[in-house]
């Protein structure tokens, strides 16, 4: 798929802040807020041998096949570290990885798969962030990334665990309506994982992993590969 360099304005996906009840620590145990529990992990084991790790300053890490490029998706060489890029996910992301850059000659940023992690923790509950991001991307797939639109149902977020930390996961598919150009696949996949954390003020926040990938035609990355990339998200125990 191809994306213009100014695809979306950074920070355009904004989750609603959930109301919080302050707990004084005094009174019965029944007054204590319920601690969120992690769901099942997506990974059935470690990443495949030979894959390269992509590390985020937030402590999250994921793994990609050895042939993928790691770094700024626009190919910018930053001497002072990775300032982050908005490649169309609606987030400024760091720890980006891209598969099959430039496969389409029609111009803009073309790729088969692109992955990144939000540059900072985003305010609000993780579930709300995952669902808000998915709804916004569904709208972008329908209105911005396709010529005649797309049918993009958005499933509910499901509870998962990332290294034992509660997280919420949404995987959606946009079925592209004809006609479509040579850079638009029949199906556009978009995955979001929002990992629960806390902001500097102690309020709920989340770190967001996003992945966009082509499906449904020759030359795309295998579904098994994409699933393994998503499942590899974890906290880096070396930091």
Regions found by a protein language model. Give the residues of each.
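N-terminal targeting sequences that direct proteins away from the cytosol to non-cytosolic compartments
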Residues: 1-91, 203, 213-239
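Bulky hydrophobic/aromatic packing residues
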Residues: 46-51, 55, 137, 183, ...
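Surface-exposed beta-strand edges and flanking loops
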Residues: 56, 66, 94, 162, ...
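Conserved polar/disulfide-associated segments of primarily extracytoplasmic proteins
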Residues: 80-186
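Extracellular/mature segments of secreted proteins
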Residues: 28, 111-114, 190-192, 206
